[in-house]
């Protein structure tokens, strides 16, 4: 445990950031999985789930959670599934 006040604050701040980043990444993965399962099942709401998944991927890329090239790769893969 750090003794310096600024280091203590930094530990708190990084823990909060880690929690937010993990939550955002998990939300992205969940949206992608929901879309893939809907495509496999032939559900009616595929378009809405596709838009939600792409939005989650874009948000993760914007916040720096994933690289922009990975975001583009994921979106292309999802669009191929949607067709």
From Swiss-Prot:
**Annotated disulfide bonds:** none
Q: Which GO terms describe its biological process?
A: translation
The record's keywords, sorted A to Z, are: Ribonucleoprotein, Ribosomal protein, RNA-binding, rRNA-binding
Cellular component terms (Gene Ontology): cytosol; small ribosomal subunit
UniProt superkingdom: Bacteria
GO MF terms here are: small ribosomal subunit rRNA binding; structural constituent of ribosome
Entry's SUPFAM superfamilies? Ribosomal protein S20
Which family does the record assign? Answer: Belongs to the bacterial ribosomal protein bS20 family.
Q: Which PANTHER family match?
A: 30S RIBOSOMAL PROTEIN S20, SMALL RIBOSOMAL SUBUNIT PROTEIN BS20C
Note the HAMAP family from the entry: Ribosomal_bS20
Instruction: Please describe what this protein does.
Output: Binds directly to 16S ribosomal RNA.
| Full protein name | Small ribosomal subunit protein bS20
Question: Which species is this record about?
Answer: Enterococcus faecalis (strain ATCC 700802 / V583)
């Amino acid at each position: 445990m750090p003794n310096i006040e600024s280091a203590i604050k930094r530990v708190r701040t990084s823990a909060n950031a880690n929690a937010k980043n993990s939550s955002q990444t998990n939300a992205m993965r969940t949206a992608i999985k929901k879309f893939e399962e809907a495509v496999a099942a032939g559900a009616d709401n595929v378009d809405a789930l596709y838009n939600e998944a792409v939005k989650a991927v874009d948000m993760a890329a914007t916040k720096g959670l994933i690289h922009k090239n990975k975001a583009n790769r994921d979106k292309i893969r999802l669009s191929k599934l949607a067709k």
